[in-house]
């Protein structure tokens, strides 16, 4: 019997492949995206020291109270704007975008566009 790997296993394989090439430095850290069925998370990571510099998610009170349901594109755009504002406040202007093995479409694309709107460059 042939067993088809789940989409998450395939995503993790893609993510490992991408992580070999995408590396966050202190000058240009990595903007990592993780999406679940009901929420979306973003982190700005410096891989040289393995430290998260800034993070934002749709679970935060300011986003959840404004939107209610947070598993949609509108919430992803708000998370992108929030993580960009926090990064700019910490002096981070340029990042490397790590889509986490997800295709650049839907919520991942909206998060990236929201971050660009707020002034983050990648």
UniProtKB/Swiss-Prot annotation:
Top-level lineage group: Bacteria
Keywords assigned: Ribonucleoprotein, Ribosomal protein, RNA-binding, rRNA-binding
GO cellular component: cytosolic large ribosomal subunit
Gene Ontology process terms (BP): translation
SUPFAM superfamilies reported in the protein's UniProt record: Translational machinery components
Gene3D superfamilies the UniProt entry points to: 3.30.420.100
GO molecular function: 5S rRNA binding; structural constituent of ribosome
Coiled coil: none
CDD domains per the UniProt record, alphabetical: Ribosomal_L18_L5e
Pfam families assigned to the protein according to its UniProt record, in alphabetical order: Ribosomal_L18p
Intrachain S-S bonds: none
Family, similarity comment: Belongs to the universal ribosomal protein uL18 family.
Assembly and oligomerization: Part of the 50S ribosomal subunit; part of the 5S rRNA/L5/L18/L25 subcomplex. Contacts the 5S and 23S rRNAs.
UniProt-listed PANTHER family: 39S RIBOSOMAL PROTEIN L18, MITOCHONDRIAL (PTHR12899), LARGE RIBOSOMAL SUBUNIT PROTEIN UL18M (PTHR12899:SF3)
Task performed by this protein: This is one of the proteins that bind and probably mediate the attachment of the 5S RNA into the large ribosomal subunit, where it forms part of the central protuberance.
NCBIfam families attached to this UniProt entry: L18_bact
Name of this chain's protein: Large ribosomal subunit protein uL18
Gene: rplR
